[in-house]
From Swiss-Prot:
It comes from the Archaea. This is Uncharacterized protein AF_1382. InterPro entries: WH-like_DNA-bd_sf (IPR036388), WH_DNA-bd_sf (IPR036390).
Length: 95
């Protein structure tokens, strides 16, 4: 199980999905599956599959508001996203 969670973080789309949730939450925005799907240019079904895996890894929580699921990072997910952001910053500043 641990191995699968680590592999999940190194998939490009999964990383893009996680960081989309992170950046949107920084702006105080609620994040929905359909929004993520359009932002990362992936099918709704694929985004939902990745979100479920993030949920199993306790990186996100899904909250139902009416018929819409809102996706939020857990503390663990927030810490992981912040570390990834630090790596991105290092790579972007390495010129």
């Amino acid at each position: 199980m641990e191995d699968e969670r680590i592999k999940l973080l190194f998939k490009e789309k999964a990383l893009e999905i996680l960081m989309t949730i992170y950046y949107e939450s920084l702006g105080g925005n609620d994040v929905y599956i359909q929004y993520i799907a359009s932002k990362v240019n992936s099918p709704h079904s694929y985004v939902w599959l990745i979100i479920k895996k993030f949920e199993e890894a306790k990186m996100v929580e899904c909250e139902l508001e009416g018929r819409t699921k809102i996706i939020r990072l857990t503390d663990k997910g927030q810490k992981i996203a912040q570390q990834i952001k630090s790596i991105i910053d290092i790579m972007e500043n390495d010129t």
